[in-house]
C-alpha cells in the first residue's frame, strides 16, 4: 500500500514519518518518581521491541526522575505533560527525546510559545496530543460538543501557534474512544497537513476489547496509507500494547520481524487437540527472532495444502500429525510429540 508522505521527525535515535518504518510506542504505568520500577518496566518493553516510550510527568519530582531514567534506558523517552508548561521546559533539560503536550490544558499561547522555543533550542520534537476529553471551551461551544471537526480545529490551532515561532518538528495525534470519530478525524487532518501522525484509540479498554477497537481504528487508517507511529492503549500490561501493535502492522505487511503464527479454527475433521497444541506452540515461539511463518492446521485439507506458503507447520491426523516445510512433509509424529518435534525443526531452520 502507498503511505502518505510526511515530514521526517527525529525522536532520539528513531525517526517518525517520511520513509521511516512505522514505530510502535507504549506508556509506562509505573510511578515515574520511582526510578527503579520505571526503568525495570522500560527494559522489559525494550525486550519486545518497543520503539519509543512515554512517561507521565505530574510534578517536579517526576521531572527530576526523568534525568535518571533516560541514562539507564536505550529507547527514546517522551515526557507527557499536562497543565504546567514549566514541567515541559524542565523535562527538556532532563534528557528527554520528545514532548507530548495537550494544548487544550497546557496554558495560553504565550506559555506554549515558551515551551516551543526551548524545544527548538534543544532539538526536541513536540507531539500535539489532542483528545476528545480535553478540547478548548470555545471550540466545544462552536461545534456544540466533541466531533471530528472540533478535534481537527484544535490540532490546527496549535500547529499554527508552533509555526508562528518557526517550530516545525511536530507530530500530531487526534484521539477519541469513538473509533469512527477517530478515523474521521485522522483522515481530515491528514488531508490538511504533512506532519507525521501518531495513531491511537484513547481509553480503548481492557486487552480483549481494547485490542479489537485499536485494530479497527489503527488498521483502517494504516490500510489507507495514513499514520507514522502507533500506540495501542490498553488497561493492562504495556507489553501487551507492543505485541498488539506489532501484530497490527504484521497483518498489513508493515512489519516482518519475528514469527508470523497462523492456525486454523478447527472443525469436525480435526482429530487432534489442536487448540492445546496451537496455544503451546504460540507460547514457545514468543520471542523467537526468526523471520518465518508457522502454521498449525487441524487436518490435511488446511495443511499443508492451504498453508503451503508457510515456512513450516503441522497438519493433524488421527492421533498423529505431519510436520511440513514449504508444503512438503518432512516428519510424521505422535500427537504428544508434535510440539517438541516442531520446535526442534524450527530451531534448525
UniProtKB/Swiss-Prot annotation:
A GO MF label: 4 iron, 4 sulfur cluster binding
Enzyme nomenclature, EC number: 1.17.7.3
Keywords, in A-Z order: 4Fe-4S, Iron, Iron-sulfur, Isoprene biosynthesis, Metal-binding, Oxidoreductase
Binding site for [4Fe-4S] cluster: 264, 267, 299, 306
Flavoprotein listed as a keyword: no
NCBIfam families noted in UniProt: ispG_gcpE, PRK00366.1
Protein name as catalogued: 4-hydroxy-3-methylbut-2-en-1-yl diphosphate synthase (flavodoxin)
Species for this entry: Clostridium tetani (strain Massachusetts / E88)
Amino acid at each position: 500500500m502507498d503511505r502518505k508522505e510526511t515530514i521526517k521527525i527525529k525522536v532520539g535515535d528513531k525517526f517518525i514519518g517520511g520513509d521511516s518504518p512505522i514505530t510502535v510506542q507504549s506508556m509506562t504505568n509505573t510511578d515515574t518518581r520511582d526510578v527503579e520500577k520505571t526503568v525495570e518496566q522500560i527494559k522489559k518493553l525494550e525486550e519486545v521491541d518497543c520503539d519509543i516510550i512515554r512517561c507521565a510527568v505530574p510534578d517536579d519530582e517526576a521531572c527530576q526522575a526523568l534525568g535518571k531514567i533516560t541514562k539507564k534506558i536505550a529507547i527514546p523517552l517522551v515526557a507527557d505533560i499536562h497543565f504546567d508548561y514549566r514541567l515541559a521546559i524542565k523535562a527538556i533539560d532532563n534528557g528527554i527525546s520528545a514532548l507530548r503536550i495537550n494544548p487544550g490544558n497546557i496554558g495560553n499561547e504565550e506559555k506554549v510559545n515558551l515551551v516551543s522555543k526551548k524545544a527548538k533550542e534543544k532539538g526536541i520534537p513536540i507531539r500535539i496530543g489532542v483528545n476528545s476529553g480535553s478540547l478548548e471551551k470555545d471550540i466545544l461551544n462552536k461545534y456544540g460538543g466533541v466531533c471530528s471537526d472540533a478535534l481537527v480545529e484544535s490540532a490546527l490551532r496549535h500547529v499554527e501557534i508552533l509555526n508562528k515561532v518557526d517550530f516545525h518538528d511536530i507530530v500530531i495525534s487526534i484521539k477519541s474512544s469513538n473509533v469512527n470519530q477517530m478515523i474521521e478525524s485522522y483522515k481530515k487532518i491528514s488531508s490538511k497537513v504533512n506532519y507525521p501522525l501518531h495513531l491511537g484509540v484513547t481509553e480503548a479498554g481492557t486487552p480483549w476489547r481494547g485490542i479489537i477497537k485499536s485494530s479497527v481504528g489503527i488498521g483502517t487508517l494504516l490500510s489507507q496509507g495514513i499514520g507514522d507511529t502507533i500506540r495501542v492503549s490498553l488497561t493492562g500490561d504495556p507489553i501487551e500494547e507492543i505485541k498488539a501493535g506489532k501484530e497490527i502492522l504484521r497483518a498489513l505487511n508493515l512489519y516482518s520481524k519475528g514469527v508470523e503464527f497462523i492456525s486454523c479454527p478447527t472443525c469436525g475433521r480435526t482429530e487432534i487437540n489442536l487448540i492445546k497444541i496451537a496455544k503451546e506452540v504460540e507460547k514457545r515461539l514468543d520471542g523467537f527472532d526468526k523471520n518465518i511463518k508457522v502454521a498449525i492446521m487441524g487436518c490435511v485439507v488446511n495443511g499443508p495444502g492451504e498453508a503451503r506458503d508457510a515456512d513450516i507447520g503441522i497438519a493433524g491426523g488421527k492421533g498423529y500429525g505431519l510436520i511440513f516445510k514449504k508444503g512438503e512433509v518432512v516428519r510424521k509424529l505422535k500427537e504428544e510429540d508434535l510440539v517438541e518435534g516442531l520446535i526442534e525443526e524450527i530451531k534448525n531452520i
